[in-house]
Amino acid sequence: MAVNVYSTSVTSDNLSRHDMLAWINESLQLTLTKIEQLCSGAAYCQFMDMLFPGSVALKKVKFQAKLEHEYIQNFKVLQAGFKRMGVDKIIPVDKLVKGKFQDNFEFVQWFKKFFDANYDGKEYDPVAARQGQETVAPNLVAPVVNKPKKPLAPQRPIVAQRTPATPKGSTGMVKKAAGDDESAGLIEQINVLKLTVEDLEKERDFYFGKLRNIELICQENEGENDPVLQRIVEILYATDEGFVIPDEGAPQEEQEEY
């Protein structure tokens, strides 16, 4: 079982943000640049695996998490590990996943003390433990979309100007190469957008599932005439002005005619 740590006050033993990041990156062979990137919860899960092998289901941890519901899933894995090892600490998941510096810094300060109280110095291969999975910094993924805006094409006409004896046909080749670069950039951008759409669909399904669970609870207690419950139902079923709910009973053939 784990040795619990209850002190969270600021002391001279607390590491600075830079020293904290250096410790995390060295221990887990990561490349974090900001404390806020700990909001994914993945690093904490791996630290628990280092301290107490088998205490967390490391295979369930999403090391490339980019969305809030994926962060929440990682923290659920961490919570299960805490419970298994008797760690008496409430994880403020709702605050941590927002990626705010202060909340994440306070939690990692506590976690560092918890780690020091429980680490026995045994060797640990973090890369092998996560099966070689590369980690992705939560707030450094989006800029990838901008990469296609820097094509190599403008550099090529300069080369053509330095060789006046080049046949006219070479100009067409340069334009073709520039077109190929532009096409490759567009394809890369499309692939990034597809991944973004997939992530958004997962997030949509996640929140829809929550709303569905709330709806079921309201239906189960429908006869209690609770004004709060009735207000929740009104909010769930409220629609924007002009919105028309599709007629689910309409024949399939009629829909196909349009």
Swiss-Prot record:
GO terms for biological process: attachment of mitotic spindle microtubules to kinetochore; cell division; cell migration; establishment of mitotic spindle orientation; microtubule bundle formation; microtubule polymerization; negative regulation of microtubule polymerization; non-motile cilium assembly. Gene3D superfamilies: 1.20.5.1430, Calponin-like domain. It comes from the Eukaryota. It holds the Pfam family EB1. GO terms for cellular component: cell projection membrane; centrosome; ciliary basal body; cortical microtubule cytoskeleton; focal adhesion; Golgi apparatus; microtubule; microtubule plus-end. Residues 14-116 form the Calponin-homology (CH) domain. Residues 175-245 form the EB1 C-terminal domain. PROSITE patterns: CH, EB1_C. Keywords: Cell cycle, Cell division, Cytoplasm, Cytoskeleton, Golgi apparatus, Microtubule, Mitosis. The keyword Cell division applies. One of its GO terms (molecular function) is identical protein binding. It is found in: Cytoplasm, Cytoskeleton; Cytoplasm, Cytoskeleton, Microtubule organizing center, Centrosome; Golgi apparatus; Cytoplasm, Cytoskeleton, Spindle. Belongs to the MAPRE family. Plus-end tracking protein (+TIP) that binds to the plus-end of microtubules and regulates the dynamics of the microtubule cytoskeleton. Promotes cytoplasmic microtubule nucleation and elongation. Involved in mitotic spindle positioning by stabilizing microtubules and promoting dynamic connection between astral microtubules and the cortex during mitotic chromosome segregation. This is Microtubule-associated protein RP/EB family member 1. It comes from Gallus gallus (Chicken). The lineage of its organism: Eukaryota, Metazoa, Chordata, Craniata, Vertebrata.
